[in-house]
């Protein structure tokens, strides 16, 4: 019988995808991810499971902006990446004090076999993502114009890639 898993959305960068392809494993940055937790379900009084999961996914997409703001992504500094994983439930630890969807992954290392999907900003989204990366800190501090710019980036479509496409995505994009 297969172990019970939970879908976790991990914020990433394109460089992290390259590392996953080349090394066959990757650590979630600081062990953090986002998932449908009891706190997130409680937060939503309406909505189905898919809508609630999308909220966790969006949290990961916003966190990808923060990773890009660090400035160490060289290949695609203006493309968000979210990695969807299926992780054994015993490795997923909700952290409601950090946010309704926040989970700590222990261990934080995952392999390509755990991939459920890869999501990457499309080229047309790069300008909005660039602006959001520049303004993410101001948005966190309540600047309304910055919040709108971040919201515009989050509204942009992220392309879906099947886990089997990881090598091609890294080599051909």
Question: Each PLM stretch: what is its role?
Answer:
Residues 76, 85-173:
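Glycine-rich, aromatic-bearing surface loops/beta-hairpins
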Residues 32-47, 72-90:
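Short, structured protein-protein interaction patches enriched in aromatics and acidic/basic residues
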Residues 13, 36-37, 162:
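Residue-level signal for threonine
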Residues 21, 64, 85-88:
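Generic structural signal for hydrophobic core residues of well-folded globular domains
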